[in-house]
């Protein structure tokens, strides 16, 4: 019977007992053959960067490190079954720190999520998983201790002047510089005309744009910006507002199960074309979170338990949608797996970077994603939208993201923990709200910091 096969490329890094935690089998790249007839063969070329085999050292270097030693590069039929392998030898340790950043980064990664580690014993490979019993034991208490309780931000205890700086200078608004948004088509990100364009915006226009970005972005007459529409979701372009029927596609798990990048791009192109025909410019998808358990409430919106597989499929979907002028909100950024709100997620720096952020990272760097939907999760004791290290340091400074960050669905009170003041101060741009209430509006819109 004719069929296609998958070329799965894995690496096994050198491991030092008690050193940087590492998996023995790591997917690094993959490809799909053409349709092959019985007995037919094909030569498939797969490439990847050596730096992609670096591991994150959260304890010592606080950076990605490619440790010296032998790296077994293998073609596998699955994560355990090696078909053939070769060895790559690193002659010395390479620490991607400071000016010696990874080629894919704008700035070198370093520890920024230490507050999310919590008081948890993390499973270690050291001495053949000697701490397994301790790491997997039920916690002695389910209560959140200090200092986390006092630092836990909810709308009920959040001071909306927290991020205001009275030394900030009021920027120019309402200027008549004669520019329109259309004039900036294909302009460089650092083009000085952007500042002149921003000077034309009025406070009311900005406040409305920020507060009411649920399934839309508002028109802004001062710069000739038209209103746009954004639609859900990962398996279909929903017809919430158009009344026009759409097509439902297989869920992301099925798309990822094909291991076919071309198909993922074609899927994104279909979503882009349907969006274009329905008058939508933004797509609330693809979902990029990690399958941690088969019982994850929103697994159907996400690709895989493997970040490399998920990231590559997501990147191709983003590319496909962009072909039709549609921007994709990769979601839910980050460390989110279900419908629960206000749930604190605790994890260490290495796991956050190597597992949970990996799909988003690949979608930004390789797919050129320029829109993000922020999760309902708390990273440690703060909502992800109030985590500047996530939204600014990692997303924008390290990965070079250039685009818009949107909250998840807001409701009329931000579910009790989301508010525009905390969001704007930490890298979120607009609120996914269809109800004009207190929390989705900036509390002090005339303050220089807010403007």
Question: Where do the PLM segments sit?
Answer:
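Short beta-strand elements
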Residues: 81-104
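Glycoside hydrolase catalytic-domain context in secreted enzymes
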Residues: 1-58, 65-75, 79, 103-451
